[in-house]
Every structure is written in C-alpha cells, then in structure tokens.
Amino acid sequence: MVSHPCTADEAKPPSEGQLARFENGKLIVPDNLIVAYFKGDGIGPEIVESAKKVLDAAVDKAYGGTRRIVWWEVTAGEEAQKECGSLLPDGTLQAFKLARVNLKGPLTTPVGGGFRSLNVTLRMVLDLYSNVRPVKWYGQPTPHCHPENIDWVIFRENTEDVYAGIEWPFDSPEAQKIRDFLKKEFGIELTPDTGIGIKPISKWRTQRHVRRAMEWAIRNGYKHVTIMHKGNIMKYTEGAFRQWAYDLILSEFRDYVVTEEEVNTKYGGKAPEGKIIVNDRIADNMLQQIITRPGEYNVIVTPNLNGDYISDEANALVGGIGMAAGLDMGDGIAVAEPVHGSAPKYAGKNVINPTAEILSGMYLLSDFVGWPEVKLLVEYAVKQAIAHKQVTYDLAREMGGVTPISTTEYTDVLVDYIRHADLKALKGQ
C-alpha cells in the first residue's frame, strides 16, 4: 500500500523527477516532469489509472524517451479520511502547490451540513481561477446535426459571481441586517421572507481570467473569442465583465485581434488574415447560438454562472459527460479533472468510460505544460477507437448493435493506436 503525505511537511516529491517552476510569468518544464495526482472516490481509481497509461504512452511515442512523466501519488476523499483523518489533507494541497502540474480523480462531497465541496475548496486554496472546458466531437453519437462544426473552449471564471457563496437564509440575522441597511441607506424595501445573495465581479479577477482565454486562443490558432454575459440586465457586474474583457484584450492583445464591429465597418465583413475576431453575446442568445451556429464560435469566455450553464449544454451536444474534459488553471498551476462525478455505483466494475479523465490529462500536458504532440496522439487514438466502435457501454448503447468493451480493454486499445500512430502524418494534417 502506498503511504501518502498527510501533513505539508511530509510532502516530498519523488527523487527521480523534477518539479516544474514558475518564473517571470512562465512555466519552466523539465523533461522528467513530476505530475502529482490522486485517484479520488468511486470510479476515480479506474479512470485515473487509465489516464496515466494513455498519457505515458503518448509522451513516450511523441518524444522517444527524451521526456517522461514521474507520477507522484497523493490522496484525497474517502481514502484520505481513513488514512489522514481529513478528506483533503494538507499534504495533498502542499504536493499540488509544489508540483504545479496535477491530475485528479472525481471526489464525493459527503451529504450533510458542515461539508463544503472538496472541488471548490481545492480551487479556492490553489487560486485556480479559470475553469477550462474544451468541447470537441470525436465521432461519438450526438444529438447535433452538424457536430463536425463544434470546436469550442469554454473559459468559466472560477472564483467570483454568485458561486462565491456570499449568501444568507431569509430568517438569519445577517439577512435582516442587510435588509435593514438597504431600507435605511437606499430606500429599498424587501419583504421579511427574502433571502440574500451577493454577486461579486471584480476587474482584476475578470482580466486575469480573460488573459488566460486569449493566450489559449492564440496558442491554438482559433479564429473567434466571444465574451458571454448578461450585461443588458446586470450592468455593473456582467456588463462590467464585458467592458473589462474588451479593455484587457484591446490593450494587451491588440496586434492579434479585430473586433466584430471593426470587421463590419472597416473590412467589409471579412476579417484580415491571421486576426482573431473578438465579439460579445448576451447569455440567453449565446445558449441558442451554439446550437444553431456552432461553427461561428471557438473560445467562449464567461463569468462563473453563465459558464456553468453553457459548458453543460455544450457537452450534451457532443455526447455527454463521459467525454467532458476539464482543466482548472491559475498562475503557474493547473489541475486536470473530468467534469463528471465519482459515480460510486459503477466503482470497481470495469465498465466506465475513462475518456473524460484521459482528455483532461491530455489538455494538461498539451496546453498547460506545452507538449502539443500529446494532444495529436491522444485525439487520434480516441477518434480511431470510436470509428471502429471499440467503446465502453455508454457509447455502445448509443451506437446500437455494438458490443461494449471494458475500461481496461478500452485503455489498451487507445495505447495500441498511439504506439502505431504516424506522428509525422498527424503533424501535417
């Protein structure tokens, strides 16, 4: 049995690898990169092991042994509670801070008062302010008529908005104080049965988030960046989010972008070659647009609540959460995690689809670490497996007439496709 660090002092990285460093705003990545991870709850151990095997195969294929991952196992969730007396031990948090490059399995937050979401706690402690949800179609069954046009990356702000948790029940002393304050100072009278919630959105947190979205768009050659907001109604929060986003983009990324208004007024409706079109959409319209005009959007940058809505809708359009990758990023630190939960009823049955965990780790290595060949190989393998109907039960039942394979068999299929892939040809596509 692996002994995990429970306290911060016990968090000692593996001697055979090296830690990534963050210097002068840039991540410095060694060739023998330490990646900290924990398996989590429920199906977590199965899908994390699957992801590790696939990612190891992709790194080995891409770099021929000149680069490798040194895995550093820590613990969280039910296992951690038994071993360390804490669902999220200080040793795990310290390991994630040290490693900077991290992979996690899903966690279960116990039902009942006094337990905050472990995922939210992790994001807050590590200041993972951008939740990144790439949404692509790999050939899986989908309700969308033209899934080939779907290539979105949703950037959801992670720390503010109504998710900040600044709220009180209607019958609390705090809510009464706020109602009294609003009445006395502003003449706003709320009935005694009114609960109170506060929606904070700040310039600094908005702009650091938008900066990450722009960097992603530039790095991946995307043609559109869209600011999603409800600023027509919430003018001083979401309206401010829109304005601060434009201000940041036009001051720091002016050479890379052209606004939609400029395209229409200066360039006859056609963007100059090599420029990213920046526009904004009202949230309710945006939720329709990704269904009706999917090819017109790439990177979508949003406040917290809107990002929650649109990312779940978007993933439903390409086959659901079994394929839904996620990446939480801050300054020089990231944690890859699937969108789905721990699904305890499927734990240990070797039937679950590990693709979301695999893709999450793929984006961690390709877009945060800077090893883009990993993405070419993993995406190729996933597409091949789906095209040949070598899939787990969730996709097999949607395809109809397909015999599902197990989690471990699916993992082996992906590894085999990676090992036999023509990387040179993939780079030329």
From Swiss-Prot:
Keyword Transcription regulation: no
Residues at which Mg(2+) binds: D308
Textual note on the cofactor: Binds 1 Mg(2+) or Mn(2+) ion per subunit.
Cofactors demanded by this protein: Mg(2+); Mn(2+)
Annotated binding of D-threo-isocitrate, by residue: S117, N119, R123, R133, R156
TM regions (residue ranges): none
Chain positions of site Critical for catalysis: Y163, K230
Temperature characteristics of this protein: Optimum temperature is 70-80 degrees Celsius. Thermostable.
Any one Gene Ontology molecular-function term assigned to this protein's record: isocitrate dehydrogenase (NADP+) activity
Assembly description: Homodimer.
Family: Belongs to the isocitrate and isopropylmalate dehydrogenases family.
This protein's name: Isocitrate dehydrogenase [NADP]
